Curated annotation (Swiss-Prot):
Predominant cellular place of this UniProt entry's protein: cytoplasm
Stated name of the protein: Tetratricopeptide repeat protein 12
Taxon lineage: Eukaryota, Metazoa, Chordata, Craniata, Vertebrata
Originating species: Homo sapiens
Record's signal peptide: none
Name of the coding gene: TTC12
Keyword match Repeat: yes
Length: 705
């Protein structure tokens, strides 16, 4: 056998070995191995096609013929090799076609499984997911979905197996790690559970908030597990309070006793709950269910107020729940995740019986002391009823009102509460509008301020602000409260200041509820500009800067009220925030009325105050200052008086700067144009500085705006 034939034979044998291995791998039970084999086969076929094309393109350059041409004979090895590869190619194409068909079937089975899962039919869901996996073994979502269904049936070991298969399909499958973490948590493999959750963070750092919550769940459950072990040991050792707690729960589990029997037993039990051991034993021996499922006690809660004994039972239960939930996250969780208890707690906050209302509020405060407790409140309580109940405490004593608003503040800072608030604002807006109708003379001023401040903070979000601003009753409520507070500005200083903050946010939303509303708001703010309080002055100017442009009628009233003089004083003595509002008001006034321009010139003869603002780092301030200066150029002889200043150079720099906002460039360009029109000598200077080109480039912004 010559060298070429030997080489071809070795190549053929190598191909046979490799192809045999590929066929074995394609028949593997491991979907990952199977997928790699399919990809490798496709790669080999591609290379074979390239080789064939290359062979077809070869031409013989030496055309000398010594003997007649003979038909090229292929060796048996070559024929067998090509036939084998052809069969592999055909098989690969058939497999690809079957895979596409199976993908469609697997997707359909996945949807059926999801429907069954949503209906709570977890066995059927598992069956459908399994059928889908028979069609497509490397579909990771079927493994994670089936794992979730197994979790619902508390078959955690099978769930873990499915998660492992999902990770074989995709080693960065965060869903698989999530379900693995949950399953290991249920199996009390706390360290393994933590590692699973931390792996999610490694794969996707953006899930930090969620992972933090998962890890917190692991910590809490491990802590509860240790508490139960210790409680068992103390009970077995015969500790007096532990044994008494267990015995009292057995006594209270007796059905159909008179209400006084339960009230007395619960009060004794409450006195026994002094430590974590007793709290844990209460939970371990189904204390929550013994109390909340008792028909007599349930009847007392539903009819409380008709009978003193029934009221006593309700109060005693609420005090017991406070005792068992104090600084005990697991007991808090068990109490609140039960739907009936969560609904009852929200309802009791609005009870007509003062004692019940106060004790249910005290229980809520116990829950809200920790982050996990606040999460329980947000996730499980009826937040609309809760919010309505909290604002109703404004009618209570200063201490209770402030405590309620403190709780409202804590909840409002939680991101999940904010999401809920935006989605449910139409339902809670009437309660918030009711707050604005409160008489400040009879309510706690500090608590009222807290409540309005919460509304102000929440209104910073555009969707929330849009709903609030669109509600005519809410806007009228702001006005009426402001009017009542103006009767004694010194007494209600904090309320006015906070309310103006809310109204500033509302005035960001255009158009306003009505022009009439905007006019009335402006009048109130013009009146408040006579205040001696710096904070009120600044915020009144802030509101006015947002309402003034809505109507010429308002501008006229503002001019008659001496707003130009007051705003010029702001510019000379106020801080940056006050100056920002003042220059915007002056820009609006000078844009519409010649007398406003003349008064600015009279109060700032060389326009030095205005020109100083052009060097500010605040672009809004600079833009409005340029606009105001441009308006003032329409007053005769003003432009001529500025020939010895560097105003032209400053405006030119602003108009040509790419670092400035478009509004600054446009306003500076307009001011330049008015300056050169009013005083031709400025136009000559502009030409020398090649400023016309800059002005031309600025014009494109004006035409686009």
């Amino acid at each position: 056998m010559d060298a070429d034939k030997e080489k071809d034979l070795q190549k053929f044998l190598k191909n046979v070995d490799e192809i045999s291995n590929l066929i074995q791998e394609m028949n593997s039970d491991d979907p990952v191995v199977q997928q790699k084999a399919v990809l490798e086969t496709e790669k080999r076929l591609l290379l074979m096609e390239e080789d064939q094309e290359e062979d077809e393109c070869r031409t013989t350059l030496n055309k000398t013929m010594i003997s007649p041409p003979q038909t090229a004979m292929k060796s048996a090895e070559e024929i067998n090799s090509e036939a084998f590869l052809a069969s592999v190619e055909k098989d690969a194409k058939e497999r690809a076609k079957r895979r596409r068909e199976n993908k469609v079937l697997a997707d359909a089975l996945k949807e059926k499984g999801n429907e069954a899962f949503a209906e709570g039919n977890y066995e059927t869901a598992i069956l459908r997911y399994s059928e889908g996996l028979e069609k497509l073994k490397d579909m990771k979502v079927l493994y994670t979905n089936r794992a979730q269904a197994y979790m619902k049936l508390e078959d955690y070991e099978k769930a873990l197996v499915d998660c492992e298969w999902a990770l074989k399909c995709d080693e960065k499958c965060t869903k698989a790690y999530f379900h693995m973490g949950k399953a290991n948590l249920a199996l009390k493999n706390y360290s393994v559970s933590r590692e699973c959750y931390k792996k999610i963070l490694e794969i996707n750092p953006k899930l930090q908030t969620q992972v933090k919550g998962y890890l917190n769940q692991v910590d809490l459950q491990e802590k509860a597990d240790l508490q139960e072990k210790e409680a068992h040991e103390l009970l077995d050792s015969g500790k007096n309070t532990a044994v008494t707690t267990k015995n009292l729960l057995e006594t209270l589990s007796k059905p159909d006793q008179i209400p006084l029997f339960y009230a007395g037993g619960i009060e004794i039990l409450t006195e026994m709950i002094n430590e974590c051991t007793e709290q844990t034993l209460f939970r371990m021996h189904n204390g929550f269910s013994i109390i909340s499922d008792n028909e007599v006690i349930r009847r007392c809660f539903s009819t409380a107020g008709n009978d003193a004994v029934e009221e006593m039972v309700c109060v005693s239960v609420l005090k017991l729940w406070q005792a068992v939930c104090s600084r005990n996250e697991e007991n808090q969780r068990v109490l609140v995740i039960h739907h009936d208890r969560a609904r009852l707690l929200a309802a009791l906050l609005s009870s007509k019986v003062l004692a019940i209302r106060q004790q249910s509020f005290a229980l809520l405060l116990h829950l809200a002391q920790t982050e996990s407790g606040r999460s329980l409140i947000i996730n499980h309580l009826d937040l609309t009823r809760l919010l309505e109940a909290l604002v109703s405490f404004l009618d209570f004593s200063d201490k209770e009102a402030n405590t309620a608003m403190g709780l409202f503040t804590d909840l409002a800072l939680e991101e999940r509460f904010q999401v809920w608030f935006q989605a449910n604002l139409p339902g809670v807006l009437p309660a918030l509008t009711g707050v604005l109708k409160t008489d400040p003379k009879v309510s706690s001023s500090s608590a009222l301020c807290q409540c309005i401040a919460i509304m102000g903070n929440l209104s910073a979000e555009p969707t929330t602000r849009r709903h609030m601003a669109a509600c005519e009753e809410f806007g009228d409520g702001c006005l009426s409260l402001l009017a009542r507070c103006e009767e004694d500005v010194d007494l209600f200083r904090e309320v006015i200041y906070t309310l103006l903050g809310l109204m500033m946010n509302l005035c960001l939303q255009a158009p306003f509820v009505s022009e009439v509303w905007a006019v009335e708001v402006s009048r109130r703010c013009l009146s408040l500009l006579n205040s001696q309080d710096g904070g009120i002055l600044t915020r009144a100017a802030g509101v006015l800067s947002r309402t003034l442009s809505s109507s010429l009628k308002i501008v006229e009233e503002a001019l008659r009220a001496g707003v130009v003089k007051k705003m010029m004083k702001f510019l000379k003595t106020g801080g940056e925030t006050a100056s920002r509002y003042a220059i915007k008001i002056l820009a609006i006034c000078t844009n519409s009325y010649h007398e406003a321009r003349e008064e600015v010139i009279r109060l700032d003869k060389k326009l030095s105050v205005m020109m100083k603002l052009l060097s500010s780092e605040d672009e809004v301030l600079v833009g409005n200052a340029a606009l105001c200066l441009g308006n003032c150029m329409e007053v005769p002889n003003v432009a001529s008086s500025l020939l010895k200043t560097d105003l032209l150079q400053v405006l030119l720099k602003l108009a040509g700067s790419d670092t400035q906002k478009t509004a600054v460039q446009v306003n500076a360009g307009i001011a330049l144009g008015k300056l050169c029109t009013a005083e031709p000598r400025f136009a000559a200077q502009l030409r020398k500085l090649h400023g016309l080109e800059i002005l031309n480039s600025t014009m494109k912004y004006i035409s686009d705006s």
